């Protein structure tokens, strides 16, 4: 499991979204980056 302070663990939905949308090339850690202060 991925444990990152201040961020919830990636859910099944977080993982599957980039898979069905070929236009989404953003990596998980980059997507979560907007939530960091």
Swiss-Prot record:
Q: What is a biological process (GO) this protein takes part in?
A: killing of cells of another organism
Q: Which GO terms describe its cellular component?
A: extracellular space
List localization entries.
Secreted
What induces or represses this gene? By bacterial infection.
Polar residues biased stretches: 20-29
Which UniProt keywords are given for this protein, alphabetically ordered? Answer: Antibiotic, Antimicrobial, Fungicide, Immunity, Innate immunity, Secreted
Region Disordered, residue ranges: 1-37
| Tissue specificity remark | Hemolymph.
Q: Tell me the function of this protein.
A: Antimicrobial protein. Has antibacterial activity against the Gram-positive bacterium M.luteus (MIC=55.0 uM). Lacks antibacterial activity against the Gram-positive bacteria B.circulans, and L.monocytogenes, and the Gram-negative bacteria E.coli D31 and E.coli ATCC 25922. Has antifungal activity against P.pastoris (MIC=16.5 uM), Z.marxianus (MIC=16.5 uM), S.pombe (MIC=11.0 uM), and C.wickerhami (MIC=16.5 uM), but lacks antifungal activity against A.niger and C.albidus.
- This chain's protein is named Proline-rich antimicrobial peptide 1
Native species: Galleria mellonella (Greater wax moth)
């Amino acid at each position: 499991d991925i444990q990152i302070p201040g961020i919830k663990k990636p859910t099944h939905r977080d993982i599957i979204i980039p898979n069905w949308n070929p236009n989404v090339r953003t990596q998980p850690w980059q997507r979560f980056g907007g939530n960091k202060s």
